[in-house]
């Protein structure tokens, strides 16, 4: 990021802040890059965009994080804009389907891009490698940025990095904020909360990230076959997940990994910071219409 900022002569960065892990790490990385360039942290525009699914907890943590890091906070409530958009396209706002969710994500990206244009800055992407592998991102929504700093960082590593930042924080308030973010359920917060609490929990929907990151590592780093990945997972997660659970989420991984390649085929630039990546310009050159049938067939032949 430091190199990209210097190369483009950008004096401003724009980061969407949700109060979740990924946007937290993206902001921490951006702050570090600005410090290395001797640039004022106030030139980092951290934008919180509350909407239908935003909870008080994540909103408070987002604002507190920006304040403690010394960046500039801008709040853009997108409820009215999204409601008008739904009216324009004939979307029933009481129908919480994929259009309801993606409309919010794309509105947020539009806001960030336009603020970046206003400032002559760069939108910093927040999505991590685990989300990209699963396609757990809105096409041309949070999927898009001008530079994705987390693009090769798996979700499990995001958590460790944020915890490291909490452990080495220079203020108790910043540490407490980071620890509360770590303790918050992973969620895109696109569905209204229940009794003020997050109702949409990512790992309930797509499976545990520690499993998916394990699958991703062995598939991309070593090219292991599905049955081999399954056997390794049985050993690695013995006593944590039973065989049926591992097989269920491994099938989910392969199904989504193949079906969602079209999102990875047009990823923005980002650094490779580990041993595997899903960039079409790097480790993963895969056609968007590749079929998962052979891999799924091998999994279907497994007898638990």
Indicate residue ranges for each PLM-predicted region.
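ATP/NTP-dependent adenylation/nucleotidyl-transfer catalytic domains that generate, transfer
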Residues: 1-19, 23-304
